Amino acid sequence: MQRTGGGAPRPGRNHGLPGSLRQPDPVALLMLLVDADQPEPMRSGARELALFLTPEPGAEAKEVEETIEGMLLRLEEFCSLADLIRSDTSQILEENIPVLKAKLTEMRGIYAKVDRLEAFVKMVGHHVAFLEADVLQAERDHGAFPQALRRWLGSAGLPSFRNVECSGTIPARCNLRLPGSSDSPASASQVAGITEVTCTGARDVRAAHTV
């Protein structure tokens, strides 16, 4: 475009046109000519062939729908499971945890009692150990006297006194009488063969003797 003296543009030679129009592409021009030369039946046949070669979406759509339904069922199962877990959690928080706290407090009291009992058992064991040591010491200190007394009695030749079984005690003021004898006191040789002892005191004392 060129401007004239009056300021109005006027067309000039090959000025103001795009490069593709000034120099058209030969290949594109050939395709336009070929499309223009093709008859209408060929175009319709091409469209029918394209429709025939295009797969029908029915089977694929059905498969997708089945997949979506399966996912929805699984989602529903998951939601029901989540609700069940939520209800169980609420029950645990509201009911079971207070019971557990009470049991915990009770167990702490039991543990304290067990600790006190263990301390008492240790103290008793300590005292028993001391008492046992004292008993052993007393046995060591006084155990020789009864043994010496038994040895002395055994060497004295008085076996009759070891076999006397008495049902009572004989008072100091008591006269021994043998059955069938006189009222005089019995001698030591007669006492050795006593089968029955009678006392003139307030009560009778009976003894059995085995020679």
Swiss-Prot record:
It is found in: Cytoplasm. The record marks 60-61 as: Breakpoint for translocation to form BCAS4-BCAS3. It comes from Homo sapiens (Human). This is Breast carcinoma-amplified sequence 4. InterPro entries: Cappuccino. Residues 1-21 are annotated as: Disordered. It comes from the Eukaryota. GO terms for cellular component: BLOC-1 complex; cytoplasm. It is linked to A chromosomal aberration involving BCAS4 has been found in some breast carcinoma cell lines. Translocation t(17;20)(q23;q13) with BCAS3. Keywords: Chromosomal rearrangement, Cytoplasm, Proto-oncogene. Belongs to the cappuccino family. Brain, thymus, spleen, kidney and placenta. Overexpressed in most breast cancer cell lines.
